[in-house]
Structure formats: C-alpha cells, structure tokens
C-alpha cells in the first residue's frame, strides 16, 4: 500500500513539474503582436526561415509606408502581394500570415545570388527606383 501511495505521489509531482514547464514556455512576441514593427517582422521572417531578412524587412517598410498604408492596416498585407488572377491584393487575417505568404509566393522562386537582382528579374515592383530605395532602407 505504501509503495502504491509513493508511486501515485511521485507521478503527481512529475506531472506538476511537467505542466509548470509547459506554462513557462512563452509564445514569441511577434506571434501575438497586433501591429508590425521592423523588429517584429524580422523575428517573424526568421521564424519562417526567410532568406535575406534585412531586405525583406526593408520591403515591408517601403511597401507599407512604415506600416501605415491601407493595405497594411486593412488587409494585413505587408508586401503589396497581389493576386493577378483575381486582380486584387491579398487579404490576410494577420500580418504574420503575410510574412509566411511572402516566402510561399515570392521566395520559392529564389535559388541563390544577388537578391536585389532577383527582385528586379521577377519584376517585383513597377517603380524603376525600387531597388535603390530598398538599398537605402536595408
């Protein structure tokens, strides 16, 4: 009987310790942030394993006018991602989804080399000075 009681108490103690460790794990700040900042976009891009993160963050700043544009505020679209099939800008539930979509819709095409040249090659932006502006920000 004592062995059973000891085993039960030991199991309860181990379970409590395990549960407290789960509670201690914190959700990364960027996951719960309602509004993007360069630092949070950087963390999110790193989490999703985007390449050339500094350039991607600069794109988010440039595309949204420092996160103040209509597309950023109302669509959570940090990169001006456009659905050419439906002729509409993508709408995301969260800005974090926009970062994830950037990897899926833009970076999947990138293999290696100069990222600025890649953006120019895929005609990411219509503005002929886009790369120059991006370099100033990144």
Show where each model-derived region lies:
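Catalytic cores of secreted/periplasmic lytic hydrolases that degrade extracellular macromolecules
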Residues: 17-138
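Bacterial Sec-dependent N-terminal signal peptides
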Residues: 1-23
């Amino acid at each position: 009987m004592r062995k059973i009681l000891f085993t039960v108490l030991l199991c309860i103690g181990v379970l409590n310790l395990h549960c407290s460790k789960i509670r201690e794990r914190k959700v990364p700040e960027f996951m719960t942030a309602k509004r993007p900042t360069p630092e949070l976009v950087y963390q999110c891009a790193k989490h999703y394993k985007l390449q050339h993160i500094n350039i991607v963050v600069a794109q988010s700043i440039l595309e949204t006018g420092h996160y103040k544009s209509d597309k950023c505020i109302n669509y959570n679209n940090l990169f001006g991602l456009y659905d050419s099939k439906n002729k509409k800008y993508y709408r995301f539930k969260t800005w974090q989804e926009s970062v994830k979509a950037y990897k899926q819709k833009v970076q999947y095409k990138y293999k290696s080399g100069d990222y600025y040249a890649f953006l120019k090659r895929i005609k990411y932006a219509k503005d002929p000075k886009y790369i120059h502006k991006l370099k100033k920000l990144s």
